[in-house]
UniProtKB/Swiss-Prot annotation:
This is Cytochrome b. Heme b b566 binds at residues 97, 196. Its cofactor is heme b. Heme b b562 binds at residues 83, 182. Its main location: mitochondrion. Coiled coil: none annotated. The keyword Electron transport applies. The gene is MT-CYB. Binds 2 heme b groups non-covalently. The keyword Metal-binding applies.
Length: 379
């Protein structure tokens, strides 16, 4: 009798990717975040689909349609808050996933890493457009401020912004197109994720030691399927704690006021997961300079393979690099805090120092520490 699992064209793909996949025997819980991101994506697509059934992308009715979802639709409130807080969980998993890649040298897999950076940018674009849809005060002003940054591009900037707006300000046309893009992008993300996995399965997973694990592989199922299920349960636990006990903890109170172009909020800020980049943007007094720093703060990830000077792949046995890595994490937390503060003393100078530190750590200090580590081991 033939094994359908190994002969059927579709089942064969599933089998080779999730069942009989040879995986390193020593990958830790830091390797759980890939599957958690997949779960987050599916959850966001499903909750988003049900929200889209009741949402209207018109400036006059968008805000009230979200209110209608929360008040009148059966379990609409839980779908709405699962979607909003699901985005936060998505980004927590994303940051952990990228951090794991940086710490253990996963960026040596060039194709997988670069596709991952593309995924990060796409997810950030999707989340930004999603934040505009409820058409609250922070939605409107966030959209105005962030899209306006494109006007810093020489020659074509102003035309580009008006083209994206579909007029001379953020208005009905902007909201409609943002809804269209916000709906389609998660499916594009899912497609790019398939390519991400395709490239990963060409090389196999990295592991904490950073050395080849070809001589010590175990099947993905049941060992890592059960481990991923545990991770998924913990993710859903944290998400439901947020949704049911503190649904507005990570949101902005200003977004409960309908968008008003005549009234500017005291501090305009994006969602918490963009605050680190927003702080870097604000720390530079020049508009174009700020925009470049903002883009580079994420795009710098592409340079990681070039900045890898160590003879070892992972940071597991590199204490100096480890210290700098955790300083970088602390620096990003500082930037996140600063991004949510008003532009005044002492926040301005703290933000500027943290921004300088961010680029200094990645571009100078960490490669230098790796070289020192090589010399200490007389390599």
């Amino acid at each position: 009798m033939t094994n359908v699992q190994k002969t059927h064209p579709l089942m064969k793909i599933v089998n080779n990717a999730f069942i009989d996949l040879p995986a390193p025997s020593n990958i830790s819980s830091w390797w759980n975040f890939g599957s958690l991101l997949g779960i987050c994506l599916v959850l966001q697509i499903l909750t988003g689909l049900f929200l889209a059934m009741h949402y209207t992308s018109d400036t006059t009715t968008a805000f009230s349609s979200v209110t209608h979802i929360c008040r009148d639709v059966n379990y609409g409130w839980i779908i709405r808050y699962m979607h909003a807080n699901g985005a936060s969980m998505f980004f927590i998993c994303l940051f952990m996933h990228v951090g794991r890649g940086l710490y253990y040298g996963s960026y040596i897999f060039l194709e997988t890493w670069n596709i991952g950076v593309v995924l990060l940018f796409t997810t950030m674009a999707t989340a930004f457009m999603g934040y505009v849809l409820p058409w609250g005060q922070m939605s409107f002003w966030g959209a105005t401020v962030i899209t306006n940054l494109l006007s810093a591009i020489p020659y074509i900037g102003t035309n580009l912004v008006e083209w994206i707006w579909g007029g001379f300000s953020v208005d009905k046309a902007t909201l409609t197109r943002f809804f269209a893009f916000h709906f389609i992008l998660p499916f594009i993300i899912a497609a790019i994720t398939m390519v991400h996995l395709l490239f990963l399965h060409e090389t196999g997973s990295n592991n904490p030691t950073g050395i080849s694990s070809d001589m010590d592989k175990i099947p993905f199922h049941p060992y890592y399927t059960i481990k991923d299920i545990l991770g998924a349960l913990l993710l859903i636990l944290v998400l439901m704690l947020l949704v049911l006990f503190a649904p507005d903890l990570l949101g902005d109170p200003d977004n409960y006021a309908p968008a008003n172009p005549l009234n500017t909020p005291l501090t305009i800020k994006p969602e918490w997961y963009f605050l680190f980049a927003y702080a870097i943007l604000r720390s530079i007094p020049n508009k174009l300079g700020g925009v470049l720093a903002l883009v580079l703060s994420i795009l710098i990830l592409v340079l990681m393979p070039l900045l890898h000077t160590s003879k070892q792949r992972s940071m597991m046995f590199r204490p100096i690099s480890q210290c700098l890595f955790w300083i970088l994490v602390a620096d990003l937390l500082t930037l996140t805090w600063i991004g949510g503060q008003p532009v005044e003393h002492p926040y301005i100078i703290i933000g500027q120092l943290a921004s300088i530190m961010y680029f200094l750590l990645i571009l100078v200090l960490m490669p230098t520490a790796s070289t020192i580590g090589n010399n200490l081991l007389e390599w």
